[in-house]
Amino acid sequence: MDTTPAAPDASFDLDPAEIRVLGVLVEKAFLTPDAYPLSVNALVAGCNQLTAREPVMALSEGEVQAAIDSLLARRLVSRRDQAGGRVAKYEHQLRLRHSLPPAEQAVLALLMLRGPQTPGELRSRSERMHRFDDIAAVEAVLEHLGEKYPPMAAALPRAPGTKEIRHMHLLGGAEALEAAAEGLASAAAGGTGRGRLAELEEEVQRLRSEVAELRAAFDTFRQQFD
């Protein structure tokens, strides 16, 4: 396994297949440690699960292998060659690359595999990976992920008709965050009153400003390695 130190990612811009593969590796390290690290076939099965996945995907072996190769190049995944083993197996490197303890790995895996969620949803769904004493503990993890450089999670504007704020991962880059905000604006246009729509438009504008700040921070960080 290559252990040569690498510069931290200046920004995240993983595609959906890469996010799914990375999320599966983190999840299975918790849930099936005896079968970890994972082969390509095991990763295909995990990526295309019909449960605990949003959205459900149908990735081919070639697509999964391409995602693995990209993650290997980013040092987010490594290959582990086992004595006497003929099949290549892979493990994630989030703990080493981004100093993520188990609680943060569990929350990030859920966000990668199931999309934006509330702290309450994250607490209940993380039970098999990491037990949180209360919602405040989840919120503390989300806050810490958001304070990383570059940030790994962010809060979304409150969706129409809901009381709780959802959080999403930022491994897809600032564009993914902006797309999520645009989706909320579209949902608002479908069935909310003018007052609520104006409120949501203000929230989207605020989020766009945060995206611009994130991009500026990414550019500044990237210049350190040019």
Swiss-Prot record:
InterPro entries from the UniProt entry: DUF480, WH-like_DNA-bd_sf, WH_DNA-bd_sf
Family listed: Belongs to the UPF0502 family.
Protein name listed in UniProt: UPF0502 protein azo0627
Source organism: Azoarcus sp. (strain BH72)
Classification lineage: Bacteria, Pseudomonadati, Pseudomonadota, Betaproteobacteria, Rhodocyclales
